[in-house]
């Protein structure tokens, strides 16, 4: 009996070597997959250094499946660059870029980059909704504080180093909220 499920693969170029993808893709090209998402780095690199666009280009030209690009997309320009360079892509995955700039997908969809003031206002609105949710689900102010600090983990560039450090060093919810008001 056939299953209604489809399978996708998310992968990097390799673990230690940027050529490790080649024999893997030979196998993947011969099995039924919905899509492949490629992050063009090697595993040992984690998120350090640059993505390897030369290797992505080779993968793109060899892959027989629908392909999704993933890696280092933090601006609308980054998205357009990938979109224009690889017109046969099935999609683009935004990971840490969206965590660092939560308005990025909305900016892309609207076709315009938001002003700093617009981004800050939307960031505060999102933050306030999240705080309100945690106030109804968390057991204590300490839990709310702990969870909310994670909200800012990738946003240092967006909010500035000084206020980011204040948020991270805030020892309790009151000090945390005071630091957030400085954004």
PLM features per residue range, with description:
Residues 1-183:
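Flavin-dependent oxidoreductase catalytic cores
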């Amino acid at each position: 009996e056939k299953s209604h499920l489809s399978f996708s693969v998310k992968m990097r170029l390799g673990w230690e070597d940027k050529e490790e993808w080649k024999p893997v893709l030979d196998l993947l090209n011969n099995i039924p997959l919905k899509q492949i998402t490629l992050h063009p780095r090697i595993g040992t690199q984690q998120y350090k250094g640059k993505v390897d666009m030369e290797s992505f280009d080779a993968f793109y030209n060899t892959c027989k499946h629908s392909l999704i690009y993933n890696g280092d997309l933090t601006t609308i320009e980054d998205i357009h660059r990938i979109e224009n360079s690889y017109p046969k892509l099935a999609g683009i995955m935004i990971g840490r870029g969206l965590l660092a700039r939560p308005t990025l997908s909305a900016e892309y969809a609207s076709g315009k980059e938001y002003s700093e003031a617009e981004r800050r206002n939307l960031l505060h609105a999102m933050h306030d909704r999240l705080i309100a949710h945690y106030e109804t689900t968390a057991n204590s102010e300490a839990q709310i504080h702990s969870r909310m600090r994670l909200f800012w983990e990738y946003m240092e560039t967006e909010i500035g180093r000084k206020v980011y450090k204040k948020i991270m060093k805030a020892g309790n919810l009151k000090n945390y909220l005071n630091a957030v008001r400085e954004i």
